[in-house]
Amino acid sequence: MSSRGRTDCLKRQPKIDCDHFLCVFNALVAKMSNPVDFNLYLITDRHQVPAGYTLFSVIEAALRGGVKAIQLREKDLSTDELLPLAQELRTLTRQHGARLLINDHVDVALAVKADGVHLGGHSRPTETVRRQVGTEMLIGVSTHSQDETLTAFEQGADFVTFGPVYTTPSKAAYGAPQGLSALAEACRKSPLPVFALGGITSERAAEARAAGAYGVAVISAIIGSAAPETAAKSFST
């Protein structure tokens, strides 16, 4: 081959995106050092707490019932309002050997030394957050399509939620329910653990796992229950 031919060949070589490669590499390192070691993921919503309970007491009961991961998701609270609540839950989850993830507020997660952060569709890019928190924190990402689950992996997430699987008022803004077939396809194609989200009850949890879900993410079935400890236990039977 002539020198010109070799030069043209070199010019045609694909350009390596070093930042992208580093994000994927860091994601793989994070998965080895900080695995997703829970399959019931409780997401908070203090507006659904029944009479006679506080958000703290509901979560405490859920932890007694076997929940091993809490996502603090109170979208209408400011950072100053969220921080003391996160500090209380950090102490509580440590007492029960459970994980605490903070929705969106990376600053709060770092301040209370949470186990991770959970990012939604309007959050900062996952790869940006991964660079900020390093490999010690878990990053969960909300997804609503198979393409989004793959993007989450490429950008450094550790796991994803996928939904809504069933009809649920709390996720009505995300459109019609995806159904079990879409969940199964997302689980089949995703390199990450997938948590089924949206309308999940203890009965439906079995269907979601049969479709390939690594675990389930729950809000009202436990947070809104008059017996949250019993409700939490029902997901492990």
Q: What are these regions, as identified by a protein language model?
A:
Residues 170-172:
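Glycine/threonine-rich flexible loop motifs
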Residues 213-221:
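Short, electropositive alpha-helical surface patch
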Residues 1-11, 15, 22-29:
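Short, low-complexity, charge-dense intrinsically disordered segments
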Residues 46-47, 166-168:
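A short, flexible beta-alpha/helix-coil linker loop
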Residues 179, 196-201:
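Glycine-rich adenosine-cofactor-binding loop
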Residues 29-124, 131-158, 175, 185, ...:
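Conserved N-terminal beta1-alpha1 strand-loop-helix module at the mouth
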Residues 156, 211-214:
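As written
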